[in-house]
Amino acid sequence: MRKRRLWWFVVLFRVTLVGAILPNETFDVRRYYADRFLIEDEENGSSRSYYISAESKAKAAEQFALLAPNCSLTSDIQENTCNETSSFCDHRVDSTYKTYHYEQEKCNCFIETCDEETNSTELMVLYPDCYCGKREKHCDLSKEKCHWTPDSDHDDLKFEVFESSNKVLFDYMLQAGSEKANLKMNKVSMVSKFFRQSGFNCSLRFMHHFTHQSSTSRLVVRSILQSGEKKNLYEHWLKPASVFWVPVQVAIGSYAEPFKISIDCETGFPPKKKKNKPFTCSIADIYFENCGEIRDPIEQCSRGDQFLCSISANTRCLQNAQCDSRIDCDDESDEMDCGNINGTMCDFNGQDYCNSWYQVTNVTDYHERLSEPTTVAPLNKLNEVPLHLFRLQSPSAKIKEAMRGSGNMLVFDHKPNPLTRRTSALVSPELPRTNPEAYDEKSPLFKSCKLRFYLCSRTYSKVWQISVISKGINPMESGRTIIYEAGYTLIPKENCTWERVFVNIPRQNAGFRIGIFVTNYFPGSEEYVAIDNLSFSPTCFERDINQSTWDIPDLFINTCGASGFEQPQNCDHNRELDGQTGHFLKEDGTQQWTVPVTGFYRMEICGAGGGSNSKASGDTGDCVTLQVHLIENLSLRMLIGQMGESPCFTEHDDELRPSSCSKISHNYVYDGKRGAAGGGATLLTVEKDLWNVVAGGGAGASWDGFDMEVGYGASAIHVKPDQRCNETCKAVSHTDFIVERRDNRCPGEKGESTVFGGFGGGGNSCGMLGGSGAGYQAGNPFGKSRARSGSSNVSIDFSKSPIYYQSERLDEGYIKIAFCRKRCEPPTVCRFRKDYFEEEYCGCPDGSNVTDTEEACAFPLVCPSSSTNQYRNFTYEPFCLCNNGKEIYDVYNDTCEEIQIWTLYNITFLIFAALTIIGALFVVYHYRNREKQMKQEILDLTQMKSPDYLYDDIYFGRTTRKAALDSLPSISRDSIERGRVLGRGNFGEVYYGEYSGVKLAVKMISRTFSASQASQSDFCNEALCMGTFVDENVVRLIGIDFEKVPYMIALEYMEGGDLLSFVKECRPNQVSLNPFQLAMSDLIKICCDVAAGCKCLETFGYVHRDIAARNILLTTRGPQRVAKIADFGMAKEITYGTEYYRINGRTMMPIKWTPPEAFIDGVFTTKSDIWSFGVLCWEVFSLGVVPYPNRRNEEVMLMLTEGARLEYPYGIPTRVYQLMRDCWKTAAADRPKFVDVVEIFQDIQDDPASVGMPFPIHPAVRATFAHSQSTPVSVETPMTAMTEISLNSTFTDASTVKVSAQQDMQDRIQLHELMLTREHPYTSELTSYVVNSIRKDLARVQYENGLTSVPQPEYLSPENNDESVQLIPQSNTVTDQTPPTSLIDLNRLGVQNTGPTLHRPDSLNFNDPYSSVPLLECQTR
């Protein structure tokens, strides 16, 4: 009799070790089979056989008793005997367990269980989807054939059967709910019958439509054992984003004891008041699936993405659930032994995102904000700090939690709304290489390495992405592979639905990182992204992985399928094959590779061959094989040469030979006598301006005859062309290895028939001669044999003893890189033998063989005591590194010279210290004797001022102050939509606002200052000034509100911030020498705007008194910026005569922006603003350097009084500095008016010689920028500090300054003469009194600060009248930062703020070179 066998379990005690990881190593397979029946049905359904594994027949009888009716024990139990034909014989049991057999005469899915106490029976189902005959898969709710029973604890809440209007999904449905009943913590359920057992793949499927009456409403699926123990299998509690039916699949698993399933709809608490939310719960299409298949769980749950729960009572096969921060097994075995590799699990509940992950942000460009700013910045100082776009957030009404109790999540939702477009990246720590088994098609772990996370998003496309980042690469630079990119997920409602995302991780043969990138493309939009519970599959990494693995794959870098002149376009396929080892394609066609591990590497580098014609083949390229020592994270840039093009002789040759036939000339039918183009060279470099390795390209094939219409290939060194190379030859020759197709085309009509050289500088051909090959020295196209091909070269400081040879194949160029993998015990290192560098061996660092002596592999040099033993990178040559940075290779003839130098330094220091102590004692003694006399002689300037005020009120438009205020536009503060605070101080605060769509900066005086009459006067004065001066270069007044306290002024909002902060941020930084890409014309335009605003003030007869870069605001930081004058708190109208007025009383003023007549006589005129404007121009062109660096205010006053002026900033146009000197004339009458200044600047803007000058970047800064890119060499510390630049080279005498190629020497001479020109000293009745008082005050301040040993500069001596004395002491001492405006009380001449302590920097600070080095072109003597 043929039998149809249904196997629910197959193997009793076989554990299959698959790959590197088991589904669950703690699973008890014997216990699993002792609790479950194996069932076999006859093919015709007439009988059914049961098998059980037990220790004895009696134990088996206890199990089979559940199957016998009427509670009677059966004696018809037999021990099963295996034969070869029985499929059960393939699966043996151990000696303690045997298999027993019991047979029933018919198929039966129902079991009558008895209760001995009540002597009653209850119907139980064998397993959930058991059937005999025709299968009733779906529960027809209209009939009584279902294994389900409704239950409810409320009379108005019961399930009723309804016929579905949509027959496509289902025919009938169950629905329970009530609109009027007061439902509070009630429940309506559908409960199944008890089932004897189930398979481990058993699941329940149904559809539900659930309407919440409150946030506590939920739908729960539970399993209930006979003992009453309950377990939640599924929970639905989130409010739906749509009104559609939700299909559900609930994993039940394999139960070994009777159980039943309950679908519970819980109402929760009633809804809040005034909210009518009826509760409804609808269920349809209920059925079980795969519940009888009790197969061998280990064999059936053995894939890499599966996990078998270890409890035999309820065994489940989980999919993508192991190590995902969520407990799915009752014994928590799915989350055991997880997180061994740092950073592979992240639930975002920590304080720093997750374990070792970090966030970086890159500002990409500037743009105008589209909504209210949330970045707090003062109105007059835009100190912008990059804000990260990702942040941690707890669940909210907008974004619910991904799972119950999951906690914080990673969110991007534009809340920071930064002023600039930026990109943030959440970057993982360095991860080891991926498990090779996960990428082997024959392995059960194939395609199991995934990145898993929960996602809730509402975004446009490409707003965020997940990428693989190669080891050692800056996350914001190129060299990353996108593995997941956001699509268009903008949904109509605010709430989004969480979904689980699985992303395949490409194979990684070396260490790598994962980065989650987001860019705020659309500021102010309603986009948001939420990510939670991010984890890697445990099969991604080997269990015993060594994170510093030596298993580095060989790397083969080719042209990525490109040929001829076309640059490589796509190398993704190659990157996938080599396992993402840090190799990627750059925009210019070069390729970059990052060294994964420090050690020796073998490189085989070959140039490309030349093109061929119908007569001959082109020459092959050159090859170089070498050995080089590379350090980890070093970037190598490579250009792979491509074959030169071959001429097309028919219209279809390009189809037959697409890789080398000239594509541009296929419409031109040649006469057959044409030359081919030369091959490109293959190059490698670790420096920007030097090719360390050049493998020459082969020459293109030539035809018989001679012509001169042929070109040279590119050359790394200068090549003198052959005398036969005419102008045409020179025109079609290459000067660079990276050339574009349109360059060096053949002249005239033959331009369309150019046969182009291969990428990498191959020479073009225009006639019968073939183009020469590119190389270290390009080949001569007029030469013979190999002289026409390019030569090869390896720089001596990159590799020693390279092997040069000619390639045997006419092919594209390539580079092969192999790592020396042999593990060697220190001090030996893995190296390659010098015969073709193929054999690996463990040798001494210098390449010699290891001996058994004590001196084996000893350092070959005896270094001085003040030096350390080092090995040079690349060549691995030994040398001694002195403490002063000097490198010694010949220890017998060279020394560090450090001991002698330091001895001299110590002696000098001791002498200086002794003199300092003696001088200090003398000054203290002298000061004590004259202290009383000095205090009596200090001049009180208030006694020298006229006691009469020159004005009692300020008149605007010849009206009273009140009338002028009444004429200003008024605005109600209640109509302003208030935003964030932009700035706050003692006077009050400034906040952002919007009024009728107009952006405002609202300034409010505090209540304390509102009570002061003087403060009210100043506040009104500022409003009157801005309301009177209506000009495009003056900040516009929108309105005022003086009706109630605190007073309010509404001004136009200036997004660009203050001018001083802007020019400081224009300085070179570590990323760019010109961050804002400014030109000289931009700086001139800013100064012209300020002059135009001052012209408006001059027209009205007002003096601003505080013209400085800090008081100038910019409309934007982009190219359309306009500078406007602000802060009129010190502005006064001239009411005495028509030209000036005199101040009296305690007056504070910015000394470094003030002319001599102001701080000596207290006289301010419009010419005073002219002086201040000249200092402002100096600030702009010096990029925010404080005027008169390192000078106290007292020193500045003495300098200006004696006729000294500021030096010119580096790179300033001569005409601009001439105008600045005109503004600083001693006599106010000699200074120009602002009308004249505006005309001069307009003329300068039309002068190409001025506006065409480069952006002023000091050579010291350029040198520092270049040195910052270098890689110092050290075996022990490979990443040392940047090479120090001597400050003495920065400050040179004018006669030694190198002449710039962009500026005429005559202009430089004129600039220097202007700078050396000394103005007439300022003299008045008060000059001598003020100067003497300043000298005394300066001496007193020095004594109080303990500076008694500081010698007095010569120019401070009252007896010194020699104008040749240096007014600006020659010193490299500079301030660490630009000090705030220093103010001097003219009545007491006491220094209020002298700035930070002076110090001498040890090296050039590249982070802010303008604050550490005064960028003056030369020093004055």
Curated annotation (Swiss-Prot):
The keyword Nucleotide-binding applies. Residues 925-1421 are cytoplasmic. Residues 339-542 form the MAM domain. Residues 1-20 form the signal peptide. Its EC number is 2.7.10.1. The chain crosses the membrane at residues 904-924. It comes from the Eukaryota. It is found in: Cell membrane. InterPro entries: ALK/LTK-like_GRD, ConA-like_dom_sf, Kinase-like_dom_sf, LDrepeatLR_classA_rpt, MAM_dom, Prot_kinase_dom, Protein_kinase_ATP_BS, RTK. The keyword Nucleotide-binding applies. It is a single-pass type I membrane protein. GO terms for molecular function: ATP binding; transmembrane receptor protein tyrosine kinase activity. Residues 21-903 are extracellular. ATP binds at L982, G983, R984, G985, N986, F987, G988, E989, V990, K1003. Glycans are attached at residues 24, 44, 70, 83, 119, 201, 342, 362, 495, 533, 546, 633, 726, 793, 849, 873, 893. Expressed in AIA sensory neurons. The active site is at D1106. Its main location: membrane. Disulfide bonds join C301-C317, C309-C329, C323-C338. Keywords: ATP-binding, Cell membrane, Chemotaxis, Disulfide bond, Glycoprotein, Kinase, Membrane, Nucleotide-binding, Receptor, Signal, Transferase, Transmembrane, Transmembrane helix, Tyrosine-protein kinase. Interacts (via cytoplasmic domain) with fsn-1 (via SPRY domain). Probable tyrosine-protein kinase receptor which regulates the dauer/non-dauer developmental decision probably by controlling daf-3 transcriptional activity in parallel or together with the TGF-beta pathway. Regulates integration of conflicting sensory cues in AIA interneurons. May act as a receptor for hen-1. In AWA neurons, together with hen-1, plays a role in regulating olfactory adaptation by controlling the forgetting sensory responses to odorants such as diacetyl. PANTHER family: RECEPTOR PROTEIN-TYROSINE KINASE, TYROSINE-PROTEIN KINASE RECEPTOR. Belongs to the protein kinase superfamily. Tyr protein kinase family. Insulin receptor subfamily. This is ALK tyrosine kinase receptor homolog scd-2.
